[in-house]
Amino acid sequence: LASNSSSYPSSAFASSVKNPARLLNTHFLMPPDIIPVELMSCGQTDAAIIPLLAERFPGYGLTPYVVRRESMGFIFNRIWAAIKRETLAVVAEGVATPQEVDAIYHQATSGIPVGPCRLMDAVGLDVVLAIEEHYAHERAGLPEAPRTLLRQLVAEGRLGAKSGRGLYDDYGPA
């Protein structure tokens, strides 16, 4: 039994399953054409399960990364959270437009095809907001401005690509 959540570790619901030795997180990144998958134990996961998945996932075109200890956000999303929050702060403060943020990000990262604003639009700003609210609840001291901007966009129905408008307005009708 595997959870895809990177915000909620499977240890949070291990007591609710019959056999927690079969429980773990397998976090597939978004959008779905990104191939890393993070594997994290619930703390009671059978010691053979994660190595087995790490061995088999490459056969499906996936690159497994084992999270060595429980961590809300796992590996990538902890790094991504900082990029995302600072991106939203830059836009919220009027320092740069989403297009300018993505353009400089693209150039500075040797051509990563999608900047942080497009990626947040692809994930869905409502989803990004829910994750950010959860992180803020779990980690004191995170800046408020990024969540304020997200709340405003979501209230306006600007959810990203799925609604036709988000940080970008060029998606066409949803």
Where are the model-predicted features located?
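Rossmann-fold dinucleotide-binding core
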Residues: 3-69, 73, 77
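NAD(P)-dependent Rossmann-like dehydrogenase/reductase catalytic/cofactor-binding core
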Residues: 48-51, 58-70, 92-93, 98-174
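Residue-level signal for cytosolic alpha-helical hairpin/rod architecture
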Residues: 84-85, 132
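A broad, low-specificity signal for short, low-complexity segments enriched in glycine/proline
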Residues: 1-4, 130
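Mid-domain beta-loop-alpha active-site segment that forms a flexible
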Residues: 75, 83, 123-127
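N-terminal alpha-helical segment
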Residues: 33, 83-84
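Short glycine/serine- and small hydrophobic-enriched flexible loop segments
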Residues: 85-92
